[in-house]
């Protein structure tokens, strides 16, 4: 309905002298079904050329003032700093087997943890192996983190095959 109102407003402003055209267009819009309107919109968007799009983008970027840019960048960095990836659908998290570090920008997705191989570089894994650097017991496969290392769990018995 909002789209219809916008179309009517634009059409009215362009053809303010021709009342008969306005009435005809208004009647057509009122009688048009939603599918007809969506088809018309799709046809219009398909007819837009690349040059028209690039011109529109250039005009939009020219309208951004220099004072707006630092504010936008500052707000974006604050949002990204709060974005600690725990959900696999999030933008900047790493999946299993990918490079990771224990920084904000290279976290593992979901329940994956970063198994460090060096000073800050590692690989995302399901759980940390024995003697790997840990902070929480839940990160270790053994579920036992002592003195920042994953330790053997004496309560878990390994059954030989």
From Swiss-Prot:
InterPro entries linked to this entry: UPF0506
Segments traversing the membrane: none
Domain of life of the organism encoding this protein: Eukaryota
Assigned keywords, A-Z: Disulfide bond, Glycoprotein, Knottin, Secreted, Signal
Location(s), subcellular: Secreted
Recorded GO CC terms: extracellular region
Pfam families documented for this protein: UPF0506
Keyword Plastid attached: no
Glycosylation sites: 15, 19, 31, 43, 47, 59, 63, 75, 121
Main location: secreted
Signal peptide bounds: 1-13
Cysteines engaged in disulfide bonds, as pairs: 127-141, 134-145, 140-150
Domain notes: The presence of a 'disulfide through disulfide knot' structurally defines this protein as a knottin.
Similarity field: Belongs to the UPF0506 family.
Name of this protein: UPF0506 protein SJCHGC02965
């Amino acid at each position: 309905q909002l789209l219809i109102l916008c179309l009517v407003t634009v059409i009215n402003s362009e053809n303010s002298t021709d009342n008969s055209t306005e009435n005809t267009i208004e009647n057509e819009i009122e009688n048009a079904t939603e599918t007809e309107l969506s088809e018309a919109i799709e046809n219009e968007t398909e007819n837009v050329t690349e040059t028209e799009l690039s011109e529109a983008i250039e005009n939009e970027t020219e309208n951004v003032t220099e004072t707006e840019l630092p504010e936008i960048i500052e707000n974006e960095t604050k949002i990204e700093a709060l974005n600690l990836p725990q959900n696999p659908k999030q933008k900047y998290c790493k999946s299993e087997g990918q490079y990771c570090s224990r920084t904000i920008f290279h976290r593992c997705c979901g329940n994956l943890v970063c198994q460090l191989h060096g000073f800050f570089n590692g690989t995302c894994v399901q759980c940390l192996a024995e003697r790997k650097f840990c902070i929480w017991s839940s990160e270790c496969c053994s579920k036992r983190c002592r003195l920042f290392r994953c330790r053997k769990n004496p309560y878990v018995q390994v059954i030989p095959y």
